[in-house]
Structures are given as structure tokens and as C-alpha cells.
Amino acid sequence: MSLFGDTIAYLLSLIEDGEGKAELAEKLHCWFGGKEFDLDSALEWIKNKRCLTDIQKALIGASICFLKPKDQERKRRFITEPLSGMGTTATKKKGLILAERKMRRCVSFHEAFEIAEGHESSALLYCLMVMYLNPENYSMQVKLGTLCALCEKQASHSHRAHSRAARSSVPGVRREMQMVSAMNTAKTMNGMGKGEDVQKLAEELQNNIGVLRSLGASQKNGEGIAKDVMEVLKQSSMGNSALVRKYL
């Protein structure tokens, strides 16, 4: 995959699946695909995207600034504050040393990625802030390599947290994870489905999940809710009360 393709993949790995992720993916493919765009407008879009966390906004914003460093008229607080607000004085010092001594000597994406892999996330955040404030001191490949290494660490943390919740010894936590996954699937189908039948089916699924939450699903059968939602989406001939009859 190309340099920009790798960057898009790492950035999207940070975001939870859903309609917002699909919309962001389309934007990233346009920005990194060579189409001309206004940097300030793109940054405003990222800043106001509610489905993104502060760190995610900062990383995505920094990545497109690395594409067009000469077009940036001013530094953005929504980028600098999350990058500089994490970690201790010691980790920030490590990030500064990483940026000033090691990354300045790098010339390629993979070289920067491999060096960044050996540092903790808070140090990489501060290193990225230094790169963002002094873009002329680093090549675009080095800046994107450092950013992608950080994205991999962040995505790994999120995956472990999600897996821990999915394997929780508390049945209620496992059941709610299934409920959330099922609701996200139904809401995405409702938002992106173009056919009236698909949207109607998605609304029925959301109502069914609401009933299950209100009245309570059995501990034993709660595990299969998300899978059943997917099956209902594939086989729309099922009755709208199928889930309720099965789990109550």
C-alpha cells in the first residue's frame, strides 16, 4: 500500500465502526487522494465532528496539516492542546528529545515508524506536537511515520479494552456489549440505507432492542443479539417481533 494509503488505514483504525467512520473515510480518501481542498475548511470539519475524541481530532488534524504545511495560516488549539496535555514532565522531555535528536535524522516513513514504536504514547504525542509546530524541520514521510506508529499504539489499547469488556466475567457487561453492537448496526443501516424497506427494518430493530433493554433479556441468550440483528438485516422476511419472542 502507498504512504497515504497506510496513513488512512492507521487513522481509521482509531475510530469505532459506524456512519461517522464511513463519512470520515470518504473525506480522508479525498484529502489524501490528491484532490485539491481548503485546509482551513477541512480542519473546521474535523474540529466539529462529534463522533471523534479530542485525541482523534488532533491526530487527524495534524495529518492533513502535514500534507499542506505551507497553507496553514495559524496553529490550531484543538490540535496542540491534546498533543501537549498528556503525560508527565519526564515523558514530554522524552518526546522533545525524540523529535529534536532522532527524528531529525530520519529520512523515511518506515525508519521513523520503527523508532517511534519503541516509545510510549505520551512521548509520541509530544513529539508530534513539536513536529506540528516546526513542520519545516521534518519530511512529510517522517511526520506521517511517527503519527502512524502512535495510531497503532492507540488502536491496540482500544482493541484490548473492547476485548476485555466482551470477555467480562459479568454477564450484564457482556450482554450490554452485544446490545451496543446491535444498536450500532441498526442505526448505521437506518442512516445509510437507501431503500425504504431497509430503513423501516432498521427502525424496527432499534425498537426491538429498546424493548429488550426495557424488559431485560435472559443472561443465557443475550450473547447472540448482535449476530441475530445481522441475520435479520440479511433476511428481512422475519417478523419484527422475532427478537423479542426469542429473548424474553
Swiss-Prot record:
Keywords of this entry: Host nucleus, Membrane, RNA-binding, Viral matrix protein, Virion
Entry GO MF terms: RNA binding; structural constituent of virion
Membrane topology note: Peripheral membrane protein
Lineage: Viruses, Riboviria, Orthornavirae, Negarnaviricota, Polyploviricotina
SUPFAM superfamilies (alphabetical): Influenza virus matrix protein M1
Ranges for region RNP-binding: 165-248
Region feature (Membrane-binding): 1-164
GO biological process, one term: viral budding from plasma membrane
Other comments on record: Influenza B virus genome RNA segment 7 encodes the M1 and BM2 (AC P03493) proteins. Normal translation produces the M1 protein. The M1 termination codon overlaps the BM2 initiation codon in an overlapping stop-start pentanucleotide 5'-UAAUG-3'. Termination of M1 translation triggers reinitiation on the BM2 AUG in the +2 open reading frame.
UniProt entry tagged with the keyword Mitochondrion: no
Any single Pfam family the record assigns to this protein: Flu_M1
Positions occupied by motif Nuclear localization signal: 101-105
Location of this chain's protein in the cell: Virion membrane; Host nucleus
Record's function text: Plays critical roles in virus replication, from virus entry and uncoating to assembly and budding of the virus particle. M1 binding to ribonucleocapsids (RNPs) in nucleus seems to inhibit viral transcription. Interaction of viral NEP with M1-RNP is thought to promote nuclear export of the complex, which is targeted to the virion assembly site at the apical plasma membrane in polarized epithelial cells. Interactions with NA and HA may bring M1, a non-raft-associated protein, into lipid rafts. Forms a continuous shell on the inner side of the lipid bilayer in virion, where it binds the RNP. Determines the virion's shape: spherical or filamentous. Clinical isolates of influenza are characterized by the presence of significant proportion of filamentous virions, whereas after multiple passage on eggs or cell culture, virions have only spherical morphology. Filamentous virions are thought to be important to infect neighboring cells, and spherical virions more suited to spread through aerosol between hosts organisms.
Keyword tRNA-binding tagged: no
One Gene Ontology term, aspect cellular component: virion membrane
Protein name per the record: Matrix protein 1
Family from the record: Belongs to the influenza viruses Matrix protein M1 family.
